[in-house]
Amino acid sequence: MATSKDYYEILGVSRDADQKEIKKAYRRLARKYHPDINKDDPDAEEKFKEISEAYEILSDPDKRARYDQYGHAGINEEDFNFEDFAQRGFGGFDDIFDMFFGGGMGRRRRGPRPGADLQYRMKIPFEDAAFGTTKKITIPRTETCDTCNGTGAKPGTSPKTCPQCNGSGQVRYTQRTPFGQFAQTRTCDRCGGRGTIIDDPCPTCQGSGKVRKQRKITVKIPPGVDTGTRLRMPNEGEAGDKGAPNGDLYIIIEVEPHDIFERKDDDIYCEVPISFVQAALGDKIEVPTLEGKVKFTIPEGTQPDTVFRLKNKGIPHLNGRGRGDEFIKVRVVIPEKMNDEQKELLRKFAEISGDEINPEQKSFIKKVKDAFGVG
């Protein structure tokens, strides 16, 4: 992937934008930053790739759904192919027209506003990120007023049609341009674009149609999430105007560090201490995994800092089957103090090995430490 930026921000569209809006934004930006048009701008090509990548994901319903649910973690490298865009067409007089007049030309009415999106940052333990969990949270948000059912009017009364815009929410006006006179629209300042006026407001919400509440929500966290993963909960955001959908709730994950393991992508890493005798002779030891301790055989002659791999003992993949691996690095520990018997055995070992020991030479223990790369 060429970018880690928010695809919606790149195209300048909202998260509930339809395919027509997404395509229109893409064509406008692609025309603006196309490398053939901006040959003197060294940054144009990268900008064009960024725009194309955003459109490639957001124009595909399946890819867009995965991106909305998991963010960039839900998108694989093979989901994007920049070469496809070399053949895409840009053009049409309507695109140039949009650049002069901002699009729309009065064809679109505002309508009820959807609710705003919310974000909630959640810190979870390492193990919960690996295997998934369910959490209950409480968030403050606006909800539809139960007293007036979102109309904003006092029970027993109804909102009235705005006399200035006749319920359209917009008023029409004309504008003279170098191309002639054009009719355009703007939001009605009498009703604020709602198309209705409330003479007798609801006593609970004071006419807004919404109230502030503390809402308990159950969040299902899938296995494999990591710090920065974004989980989308549709329609759990702020309430929209009557007739419009709620916004979405985005759970931003932060994973707590682990005492033993470090994570890189879906692999985990840890360090296990062994004695120099175990390294030399080999041994069967217990090593930690996410599921608990397991038996592992250290082969004889193992060198310091050797890394062993346990397949499928890492983090489950977020968007598919299988898991990462666990990598175990052995740290050879040399004893700081030994009794006379232990020292004598090592001296005999040195003699058999052909190592000459005398006071003028560095001690055999120091040799062992040097051999195993420890101080």
Swiss-Prot record:
One of its GO terms (biological process) is chaperone cofactor-dependent protein refolding. Its main location: cytoplasm. Residues 6-71 form the J domain. CXXCXGXG motif repeats lie at residues 145-152, 162-169, 188-195, 202-209. PROSITE patterns: DNAJ_1, DNAJ_2, ZF_CR. The keyword Heme does not apply. Residues 222-243 are annotated as: Disordered. Participates actively in the response to hyperosmotic and heat shock by preventing the aggregation of stress-denatured proteins and by disaggregating proteins, also in an autonomous, DnaK-independent fashion. Unfolded proteins bind initially to DnaJ; upon interaction with the DnaJ-bound protein, DnaK hydrolyzes its bound ATP, resulting in the formation of a stable complex. GrpE releases ADP from DnaK; ATP binding to DnaK triggers the release of the substrate protein, thus completing the reaction cycle. This is Chaperone protein DnaJ.
